[in-house]
Amino acid sequence: MAKIILRHLIETPVRYQEEFEARGLEDCRLDHTLYALPGPTIEDLSKARGAGTPQALAEDSASTEKPPGEGKSRFQILLDVVQFLPEDIIIQTFEGWLLIKAQHGTRMDEHGFISRSFTRQYKLPDGVETKDLSAILCHDGILVVEVKDSLGTK
């Protein structure tokens, strides 16, 4: 099997290897559901993948309207932090805001010395607390912060 090399920094072939194997590279090149940033939720991604099939179109036309609150997507943030080590990343909540900070010291690269840092702030949905959040750093350098699945299931 030939390896696929993508030159765009946002594309993540590791996360969607099955998708690349099932479809040709040219089909995937402009498929924005495969981009890591900004990322769709898992539910949105599965809908987008099957949206063009006749079966999906028939299901959409036959579907009934959902009660309020059921169709809402959950809170999820995807950040490309491939340049940072896990110990360089700080995740905090403060007064209804999620703060994500990362900074690494001066390092040598092919052009000389470089240091990087960023700070992102996101308004948390009403009722979401620190204990309701989970954070995962994927092997391809994508930080995923989302509301735990147990929230809202009764």
Curated annotation (Swiss-Prot):
It comes from the Eukaryota. One of its GO terms (cellular component) is nuclear speck. Pfam families: HSP20 (PF00011). The keyword Nucleus applies. It is found in: Cytoplasm; Nucleus. Residues 57-154 form the sHSP domain. The keyword Nucleus applies. Residues 48-71 are annotated as: Disordered. Keywords: Cytoplasm, Nucleus, Stress response. Belongs to the small heat shock protein (HSP20) family. Inhibitor of actin polymerization. This is Heat shock protein beta-3. It comes from Mus musculus (Mouse). The lineage of its organism: Eukaryota, Metazoa, Chordata, Craniata, Vertebrata.
